[in-house]
Amino acid sequence: YQVSPWVLVWENGNYYLIAYTEGRLKHYRVDKMQGVRQLPDTVREGAEEYAAFDVNTYMQQMFGMFNGPLKKVTLQCENRFAGAMIDRFGTGPILSPCGDGEHFTITVPIQVSPQFFGWVAGFGPGVAVAGPPEVRAEMKRTLDSLQDLYR
């Protein structure tokens, strides 16, 4: 790979390099890199993209540093998980009461991946993907395939 490095981040016990390549910013796990060197007479690329880049937002959208399509996902959560949602997504997203006094919804940008589905499943029946329909359907397919595995 040939990249223009911009920032190092620490996530899940590993450092990741966020760098510009192929017209966009991508991340690479540092401990898996080999033969790293600076190329002579190269110009750092991606300054405009990095200026518009928010590292914290990028990290909040991703689960386990796995990429996926970026979607605005709505989660329906039991009230007891409000703290967990704030811990994960910060205080920016609005927690909207559902009207039953027991649940709220939160809509957040997510890079949808199997790791995201695993994170949601970790809350058991207390957190559900409410939308969009294609993400909810993908969550259901994931859970169905896991259930089939353990029959």
PLM region spans:
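Core beta-strand-centered patch of the WYL/Sm-like small regulatory domain
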Residues: Y1-G64, P69-T74
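Polybasic (Lys/Arg-rich)
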Residues: V55-R151
